[in-house]
């Protein structure tokens, strides 16, 4: 078995029993694949018929109203972005690229129109059609400098859906939902009448739609009902039994009697196959029925007197005595009637036609027009155009390929081609037929929550829809321009205005509900955000109206959506996460992978099934036992079939799960022993991992699940090797790899990776990359070269391993509080760096421009000490609350001066008092170090000194970077040919004769560029040198070009908003240690707040003197039912013990053979999965042991983890009691505690709910405008609300004066509080109380009602 570079350094012992069949697919593919299909940026020949290509092809050609011009689409190109991703974030720009569309304008001869089209001219050119945002490599968008994610949406799939309203008997309904266009509903009422609605407007008879489609009343009846023939004579009425098979299963309304008057089948009996045989054997071909039954029937088709041509009755007329007499008079003794006798099926349409007052197609069209356009006079042309535009014109109505596929599949017909996206007559007829079948109990209604009826709309599709909206507006503009512009040589550019496209796309990305500010607390929160599936948003549900069924877990979620990870609160169940192995198919339906079972043998062939396909199969669980030949061991197996859990014979199984973790999401798959936790707590655990703050130094979890490396790899925060090779150079900013050209099959000799340093994330956490490789290390493609934030050796590391004791300690762990050891604070375990961005904007005001300057009136020298001459803080300055970051003055209006002030001004030449200090200051409660300053200015006033200094520093840094990069390339090229050329014979060289041998000494005198000018006699060597020469020259040109581009980008002027003269951004790094009040959590939903940080000497300690790090309340476990944390603590303790064992071996000996024995015992004595230690050389073994001293990392995958026996065995090897308990001593007294305590290692996280961000106290601040009460909340620097219950408390104590103070001078008594301030300044202790402002507000509101209420100032004594 081969291990990657990072794995060799620290192999994780794995406990899973199940075989590894399929790798977890790339976690961000739902984002990247969707947008790749939309951009479709391949060359025109290889383009898919989707995304931009599809929209442009559907929208063009555009024809002018008079037919003289036609604009055709030919091709499109996506240009290069102006700035790269990093530059866009710095400048606050959008990472996008121009879309240029090649359009062909065809001009026809005006004279020949409209009879024929004679081409007069064809003009073709590329037209700019707006900017399209590009997706970064990690699946995000940079919009106005901030990273955003477009969340995928789960919405109802286009197609037809049948449902039942439980509130009314027989109220079945059908709804045809298109991808875009009008909805069409059909519904039954309690009387059995079928109604139709268009776009949920007023209902009308369903037969009106059929008539509008061109069907006559007779054709409608013929299509939806059977007919029977009744003959009549003097004896009575007889019903012909011509088609007995169609009557099978129906309840008879009459007796069937043979010629001898024997009853063959009795009335009210359900007709069976045996009965039909009896009737046929008896030779009965008709049966007598009475007039009461005949009078309930209706005529099946128009009855016409053939002799006179007179219409005796119309189709659907009731059979009456008069009608029968008229038939007899006309010589007709047989009558074709609608079959209500053997079946009720025909009655629904017949009854509906009775309600329908329209007679023909024209009347039906008018009726529909009246419903949709009430009040408009119906004109013949507009009536027909409206109806056709509703369902039959592709530009206005489209089922899309999904809708057409679903409609055909549901109706069970392939009559309509898959390429027809509008409705056909047969679709509407088929839907009504199926609805009647369901009403008759012959069909099933649809489950709307089944994932076969809900599809995922990903980012590419949403942007495509926005682009289509914008293009539709452009299309209208083109038509108008064609008719208005009168130009001899009209070109496509003259008639295309791309602004609507840019506006539509900008609106979607900046203010769309599904375009969200990326959650960037840690790599997991990024990955989870990109894999989120929301049922909310435009075209989706609203959280107020969503019921319990929609939110609940459905059987089809298995392997597609995670049943665990969803938010708590109003969005529960509406926002889901994609399961680990799930993918979205071409139609937008979620698919899960399964292993195929052939003839009882489980193969390694993988098939992805959608929820619709899965319903037809029997699927075994991943944990089902198999023998050596992959046959099932047991005869009876637990399986899933049609959404039910069943036990069935192994011979019936068709598929098997791929992995035990395939049902849960990436976040839930990170929780070890998930299977032992209550689902509610796991939900909290999965959600809280996303809130973990990356700490100063990341530490891997001792007990993991094996999913850590997958999440870290796919998050894009680690640097991954593109090619195999050797590390040539490493520092904190860059890693240089000398590429192994044979292994990587590339001509590139050098790979250079730049590291991200101290960058601010969206959540103000710090993104920093650290190299984990050393010079000379050999690496393979795909190896991790550098850790990102919250990763350790390429594994996700959100917290730290702490030694936990489950015991109470003096009430400090009451109600989930956490008692921490001071050692954790000293070791900076949970110290995190937060980077805050402060922005100062200088604007052009009415009174004059604001100015950033160090010359500020009435500010002491000490306050300006940290600023440079431009008035901007120095990088590296330590700033406290209230310190000036950017000094700025704002002009204020001139005021009238007294003669004295004018005199002073004249003497001292003072002009500064007409400006106000509006400097950017450090907010209260914060302090930190300035780590970066950015200055953006418009070009008008020229650049300030600080801006020029920053610009020069950036250019110098870029020059140095590119020079170093080229030096590395040069050294690599040099080393690739040096050994071959020394000692070779020369063909031609300056300073040497032909045939001379090249020496090392001669080469040392030449610069490397001159080496490459030497030619050699050996042809092979000459070719090699020639290749090196070409590569060297190309690299030089490329590096120089990149430097020039970078320089141009640095010097390029900044586009500031109108009225803005200058923007200064100051980045301050704030160090936050853990302290009481901070929130911490484990991975099992076990959260709490730090109550006290205890000195190490006072903490409980073990017999060997090791103090514990944390005390947790044991009462927090039984009621929460998250037992996984106990198992984690036990296994963590075993892991720690194994690490100690390895450390002891290292202290005794550093011989590889001895170390291998210890490692063999540690890794391979327990569990089924073995570690191949022979794959590591002696040096790697030694390195591995050094890295394992703190504990041996263990992977216990979800639903396939370590068993109790395994944990006990490991505890034994680690030298601990198998029950995981031990004797602890009180750190304060040294006495042992009465009982043994469970002690173990648990992985704990610091969450982004820090006390520093929440603690706040108001001194003086702003007041509400209306009530004049202090504002509330930290953001407004507000006060604490003294609410109703607090007032009761003071009343209960009888503290009248304190209460008066609270309600008046400390709140909204304006005059009182200003007097109070004056009295405090003067040293007086009196208090004058006036009327609170809120009382004045109340008084004015009462006056507004016409009641004069006033306050009586007089006292009772007067």
Curated annotation (Swiss-Prot):
Pfam families the record matches: RNA_pol_Rpb2_1, RNA_pol_Rpb2_2, RNA_pol_Rpb2_3, RNA_pol_Rpb2_45, RNA_pol_Rpb2_6, RNA_pol_Rpb2_7
Annotated EC: 2.7.7.6
Molecular functions (GO terms): DNA binding; DNA-directed RNA polymerase activity; ribonucleoside binding
The entry's keywords: DNA-directed RNA polymerase, Nucleotidyltransferase, Transcription, Transferase
InterPro entries in UniProt: DNA-dir_RNA_pol_bsu_external_1, DNA-dir_RNA_pol_su2, DNA-dir_RNAP_su2_dom, DNA-dir_RNAP_su2_hyb_sf, RNA_pol_bsu_bac, RNA_pol_bsu_CS, RNA_pol_bsu_protrusion, RNA_pol_Rpb2_2
GO biological process, alphabetically ordered: DNA-templated transcription
Reaction equations catalysed: RNA(n) + a ribonucleoside 5'-triphosphate = RNA(n+1) + diphosphate
Entry GO CC: DNA-directed RNA polymerase complex
Protein purpose: DNA-dependent RNA polymerase catalyzes the transcription of DNA into RNA using the four ribonucleoside triphosphates as substrates.
Protein family according to the UniProt entry: Belongs to the RNA polymerase beta chain family.
Subunit structure: The RNAP catalytic core consists of 2 alpha, 1 beta, 1 beta' and 1 omega subunit. When a sigma factor is associated with the core the holoenzyme is formed, which can initiate transcription.
Protein name: DNA-directed RNA polymerase subunit beta
Species, as recorded: Francisella philomiragia subsp. philomiragia (strain ATCC 25017 / CCUG 19701 / FSC 153 / O#319-036)
